[in-house]
Amino acid sequence: MSDQEAKPSSEDLGDKKDGGDYIKLKVIGQDSSEIHFKVKMTTHLKKLKESYRQRQGVPMNSLRFLFEGQRISDHQTPKELGMEEEDVIEVYQEQTGGHSTF
């Protein structure tokens, strides 16, 4: 693995005492960095989004999380979205402004 590539890391989200079904999700950023999250099927994805934002050090309102091309809302769960082991969530930084020069 080259120095340029980010090594995947993982984080557990969800209440350990509660048991339940967990899946591992891959969150891939625009820079192709990959972070693995172990998430309970009934955990609101807001928790995953907040954890990702903190790790990346960016404001939450600047990130867009997509699963199978559809934007993920905070209150949705992996179960609601039909997510399975090793599914991928894509993260994009929202770009605003800019202007064209003629």
Swiss-Prot record:
Annotated GO MF terms: protein tag activity; transcription factor binding; ubiquitin-like protein ligase binding
Gene Ontology CC entries for this record: cytoplasm; nuclear membrane; nuclear speck; nuclear stress granule; nucleus; plasma membrane; PML body
Crosslinked positions (Glycyl lysine isopeptide (Gly-Lys) (interchain with K-? in acceptor proteins)): 98
Protein name according to UniProt: Small ubiquitin-related modifier 1-A
Key word Mitochondrion present: no
Protein purpose: Ubiquitin-like protein that can be covalently attached to proteins as a monomer or a lysine-linked polymer. Covalent attachment via an isopeptide bond to its substrates requires prior activation by the E1 complex sae1-sae2 and linkage to the E2 enzyme ube2i. This post-translational modification on lysine residues of proteins plays a crucial role in a number of cellular processes such as nuclear transport, DNA replication and repair, mitosis and signal transduction.
InterPro entries assigned to the protein according to its UniProt record, in alphabetical order: Rad60/SUMO-like_dom (IPR022617), SUMO1_Ubl (IPR046332), Ubiquitin-like_dom (IPR000626), Ubiquitin-like_domsf (IPR029071)
Region described as Disordered: spans on this chain: 1-20
Complex formation: Interacts with sae2, ube2i, ranbp2, pias1 and pias2. Covalently attached to a number of proteins including rangap1 and ranbp2. Interacts with sox9 and sox10.
Gene designation: sumo1-a
Processing after translation: Cleavage of precursor form by a sentrin-specific protease is necessary for function.
Chief subcellular location: nucleus
Family membership noted in the UniProt record: Belongs to the ubiquitin family. SUMO subfamily.
Location of the Ubiquitin-like domain: 21-98
